[in-house]
Design a protein with these regions (language model features):
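N-terminal amphipathic/basic leader segments beginning at the initiator methionine
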Residues: 1-65
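Structural motif
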Residues: 44-47, 69, 85-89, 121-124
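Pocket-edge structural micro-motifs
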Residues: 49-51, 74, 91
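Glycine-rich oxoanion-binding loops at beta->alpha junctions
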Residues: 55-81
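Glycine-rich anion/phosphate-binding loops
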Residues: 62-71, 99-109
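Short glycine/serine/threonine-rich phosphate/pyrophosphate-binding segments
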Residues: 79-81, 96-99
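Short glycine-rich or small-residue beta-strand-to-loop segments that form or flank ligand, phosphate
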Residues: 86-98, 124-131
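Glycine-rich, mobile lid/loop segments that gate access to catalytic sites or pores
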Residues: 103-107, 111-147
Length: 147
C-alpha cells in the first residue's frame, strides 16, 4: 500500500468522466413478498459515463455458469471493437441463474444508451447481489434517466 496515491474526486477525478448513483428499489423485496435483508435504502444503481470513446477490456470467469451481464458485456465489447463510453451497474440482484437475465441486461444497456445518446454496444453492464432472483426492470427503467 506504500505506492498507493489517494486522488481526491473519486472516479470523477479523471478528466471527461462523470458518475452518478441512487437508490431505486432493486434491493427492496424478495419474490415471496418478504422484506429483503439488504433493504437499507442505499444506492443500488450507478452509471459511469465518458465524454469520449475509451478502450475497454474484460476479464471473464472460466466458470460454466456465467451471469447475464458477463455475456452481454462480452458481446458488446466484441461488437464495439473494445470501445466503451458507459457502465451501468446494479446491486442487490446478480442477474444470474434466472430465466430472463440476458434480456434484462440488454435492456439495461439499451436504456443507458438511449439516455446518453450513444451506441448500445458502447455500454457495459454489471450486476452484483443475490443469485437466482428475477431482476426487477421497472425500477431500472425509472432510474436510468435520472442518473
Amino acid at each position: 500500500m506504500e505506492n498507493f496515491e489517494i486522488i481526491n474526486g473519486g472516479i470523477c477525478a479523471a478528466k471527461g468522466f462523470k458518475a452518478s448513483g441512487l437508490y431505486c428499489g432493486i434491493k427492496h423485496g424478495l419474490p415471496d413478498g418478504n422484506e429483503s435483508p439488504v433493504n437499507n435504502k442505499k444506492n443500488d444503481i450507478a452509471m459511469i459515463f465518458a465524454d469520449v470513446e475509451c478502450n475497454a477490456a474484460g476479464v471473464y470467469t472460466s466458470n460454466k455458469v456465467k451471469g447475464a451481464p458477463v455475456i452481454v458485456t462480452k458481446n458488446n465489447l466484441a461488437k464495439s471493437g473494445g470501445k466503451a463510453r458507459a457502465v451501468i451497474v446494479n446491486s442487490g440482484n446478480a442477474n444470474t441463474c434466472n430465466a430472463d437475465g440476458e434480456e434484462k441486461a440488454v435492456e439495461m444497456c439499451r436504456l443507458t444508451a438511449e439516455a446518453l445518446n450513444i451506441p448500445v454496444e458502447q455500454v457495459i453492464v454489471a450486476s452484483t447481489g443475490v443469485i437466482g432472483l428475477t431482476l426487477p426492470i421497472e425500477p431500472i427503467k425509472y432510474a436510468v434517466p435520472l442518473l
